[in-house]
Amino acid sequence: MSDAPKKVVLAYSGGLDTSIILKWLQTEYGCEVITFTADLGQGEELEPARQKAELLGIKPENIHIVDVREEFVRDFVFPMFRANAVYEGLYLLGTSIARPLISKHLVEIAHQHGADAVAHGATGKGNDQVRFELSAYALDPSIKVIAPWREWDLTSRTKLIEFAEQNQIPIAKDKRGEAPFSVDANLLHTSSEGKALENPADEAPDYVYQRTVSPEDAPDQPEYIEVSFERGDAVAINGEALSPATILTALNEYGRKHGIGRLDFVENRFVGMKSRGIYETPGGTILLEAHRGIEQITLDSGAGHLKDSIMPRYAELIYNGFWYSPEREMLQALIDKSQEHVTGTVRLKLYKGGVHTVGRWSEHSLYSEKHVTFEDDAGAYDQKDAAGFIRLNALRLKLVANRNARFK
């Protein structure tokens, strides 16, 4: 192929799919392959990915393993949580929010090496292909993207494993003796798809859950923690200042211990089909509850309701791969403006799969006890004022009722 790329940067996990892609790129395109492996806090030792890349013929200087945990939480997770973003009412977007960061580094490494293409291991059925590619094109309109799943004839897991065996590519086995697939993990969440999960009528087996204890097996006594915020971002746990990634790591441990953040969800993919996944987002679930708790006393009602109204659109943009779009950045500016006074501390109760706000306080609080008290408010609020307020708001309803009565 005359227009075939000479150098390709591959988003490489060291797993089955991307190891096969690495070999396929070498044989199909005859190109030099550069690998990028992101340490997103997935909890795996990444040195095996380096070793496997070298085993497959990648030069040491072309292997990039980058710790992006702080960048991930600071620049992607935290901005998203300022919006309380949830897709279709349930999904905390753990996979979606990692893709633009990976694409960013793919493009940067491509520029560093003078590569003319990037490649990913997302299938032609899922959302990730869209997320990777929209992000890459937004960052470099001239970049070429190779998506092997849309090109090759290895259209099933069986064919992939056969290809791996024919090319001496090591295949990891999970504890049930099966080749693992469709598991995505990072500091925010773990997702599992396929295998025993494809029939949405069947309850997911216990072995699918990798990150949290079963709520039934969680401690029989509740635990209380305090999370402090500055301008919408978590900055401390129990009074101890921590970095963004360290905060999420600590919250993950609290959530793991108490069985918090499990979700069995059938979602609507951007490409049009429904898919079923098991999501575990222990720390993120705690963080979301805490952020909502501090907003309750620091966010003006009009600003809060407006923010709530745009959240579904904001979440949809992230889910569909439009992190780098003008409209997401516009919404982000509005959301960030809303967080100027979202500073304070929330006390949370963790117990058997649940997380509940039980206290919140802030120097920026809009909560006025003297106005809402059931006792004597010492003149802070004149209840007679409510009569005029109600009359004005009832005016249009009366006019409509009178009009309708004339046409009965």
Swiss-Prot record:
L-aspartate binds at T123, N127, D128. This is Argininosuccinate synthase. Its EC number is 6.3.4.5. One of its GO terms (biological process) is argininosuccinate metabolic process. Homotetramer. InterPro entries: Arginosuc_syn_C, Arginosuc_syn_N, Arginosuc_synth, Arginosuc_synth_CS, Arginosuc_synth_type_1_subfam, AS_cat/multimer_dom_body, Rossmann-like_a/b/a_fold. Pathway: Amino-acid biosynthesis; L-arginine biosynthesis; L-arginine from L-ornithine and carbamoyl phosphate: step 2/3. GO terms for molecular function: argininosuccinate synthase activity; ATP binding.
